[in-house]
Amino acid sequence: MDPNTVSSFQVDCFLWHVRKQVADQELGDAPFLDRLRRDQKSLRGRGSTLGLNIETATRVGKQIVERILKEESDEALKMTMASAPASRYLTDMTIEEMSRDWFMLMPKQKVSGPLCIRMDQAIMDKNIILKANFSVIFDRLETLILLRAFTEEGAIVGEISPLPSLPGHTNEDVKNAIGVLIGGLEWNDNTVRVSKTLQRFAW
């Protein structure tokens, strides 16, 4: 196994632990909490794939981070922060829309790269809009948090979400998955449109 893969996982586990402490002290906003929940699923999947214990990895990750911070000068930290591009978090959906449970009468599920597509094939002759929450960097979609398809009545009839066991996806992965979802919904004579935010950055 590549040692860099292991050390990356260990550091990610410790940084997630730090962010969890921030959330427990009620210092995180909605995008922060969204990423925290998503990354927890991702870490569990990676831990299972790598055969590594998360608690042990967190302790080792702490040692790695502490060693780096001890060697890092304040000036170097300032330069790193100044040169790093900042990503923006964009939200079409409210927290309620993101966290709401939904059920399918005729479920269909398909995996497209690192993304999972789910839709209800029982939905027919509806006007549907696709909404998503995601981060953007350099005016391109960076990370999809969650995409859902809503009817005019507000019912959820489809979804695209990252697979926890396959972290990381590209803008092209998201475009392909959206195409699959739209094609599946339009097959039943539904009219599908994409939110303005998605149109600008991901479609």
Swiss-Prot record:
Which Gene3D superfamilies does the protein's record reference? Influenza virus non-structural protein, effector domain, S15/NS1, RNA-binding
Q: Where is this motif: Nuclear localization signal?
A: 34-38
Q: What's any GO biological process attached to this entry?
A: symbiont-mediated suppression of host type I interferon-mediated signaling pathway
> In terms of one coarse class, where is the protein primarily found?
host cell
Q: Where are the residues of the annotated region RNA-binding and homodimerization?
A: 1-73
UniProt PTM comment: Upon interferon induction, ISGylated via host HERC5; this results in the impairment of NS1 interaction with RNA targets due to its inability to form homodimers and to interact with host EIF2AK2/PKR.
| UniProt keyword RNA-binding present | yes
User: What Gene Ontology terms describe where this protein resides (cellular component)?
Assistant: host cell cytoplasm; host cell nucleus
In alphabetical order, the GO MF annotations are: protein serine/threonine kinase inhibitor activity; RNA binding
Q: Where is this motif: Nuclear export signal?
A: 137-146
Claim: Nucleotidyltransferase is one of the keywords in the record:
no
Q: Any idea where this protein resides?
A: Host nucleus; Host cytoplasm
Keywords, comma-separated and alphabetical: Eukaryotic host gene expression shutoff by virus, Host cytoplasm, Host gene expression shutoff by virus, Host mRNA suppression by virus, Host nucleus, Host-virus interaction, Inhibition of host innate immune response by virus, Inhibition of host interferon signaling pathway by virus, Inhibition of host PKR by virus, Inhibition of host pre-mRNA processing by virus, Inhibition of host RIG-I by virus, Inhibition of host RLR pathway by virus, Interferon antiviral system evasion, RNA-binding, Ubl conjugation, Viral immunoevasion
Protein family: Belongs to the influenza A viruses NS1 family.
Domain remarks in the Swiss-Prot or TrEMBL record:
The dsRNA-binding region is required for suppression of RNA silencing.
Q: How does it assemble?
A: Homodimer. Interacts with host TRIM25 (via coiled coil); this interaction specifically inhibits TRIM25 multimerization and TRIM25-mediated RIGI CARD ubiquitination. Interacts with human EIF2AK2/PKR, CPSF4, IVNS1ABP and PABPN1.
Report the protein's function.
Answer: Inhibits post-transcriptional processing of cellular pre-mRNA, by binding and inhibiting two cellular proteins that are required for the 3'-end processing of cellular pre-mRNAs: the 30 kDa cleavage and polyadenylation specificity factor/CPSF4 and the poly(A)-binding protein 2/PABPN1. In turn, unprocessed 3' end pre-mRNAs accumulate in the host nucleus and are no longer exported to the cytoplasm. Cellular protein synthesis is thereby shut off very early after virus infection.
Q: What is this protein called?
A: Non-structural protein 1
**Which species does the entry assign this protein to?**
Influenza A virus (strain A/Singapore/1/1957 H2N2)
